[in-house]
Amino acid sequence: MAKFANYLMLFLLVASLVMLEAQSSDTIKVPDLGKRLLMNRDPNGIPCAESCVWIPCTITALMGCSCKNNVCYNNEL
């Protein structure tokens, strides 16, 4: 029960900070952390969580991933 209360308080704190930020500006802006998470800094594409060192992309190939530099990447954004 204590963990739930801690998570609930953390959620309420974050929600209130987001609400204050949204009300303080006329337009809703994406925070810097959100911009960093949305930006793709890898020139190969988005990693598909599969390597292709010994065998080609098998499971993630169904999602459009291909092998580049021994890692499966998805280039469709």
UniProtKB/Swiss-Prot annotation:
GO biological process, one term: defense response
Signal sequence interval, chain numbering: 1-24
PTM comment: This is a cyclic peptide.
Disulfide bonds: 48-65, 52-67, 57-72
Tissue: Expressed in fruit, pedicel and stem but not in leaf and root (at protein level).
Cyclopeptide (Gly-Asn) crosslink site(s): 45-75
Keywords: Cytolysis, Disulfide bond, Knottin, Oxidation, Plant defense, Signal
Propeptide residues per the UniProt entry: 25-44, 76-77
Modification Methionine sulfoxide occurs at: 63
Described purpose of this protein according to its UniProt entry: Chassatide C2: Probably participates in a plant defense mechanism. Has no activity against bacteria up to a concentration of 80 uM. Has cytotoxic but no hemolytic activity.
Record remark: domains: The presence of a 'disulfide through disulfide knot' structurally defines this protein as a knottin.
Record family assignment: Belongs to the cyclotide family. Bracelet subfamily.
The protein's name in its UniProt record: Chassatide C2
Organism: Chassalia chartacea
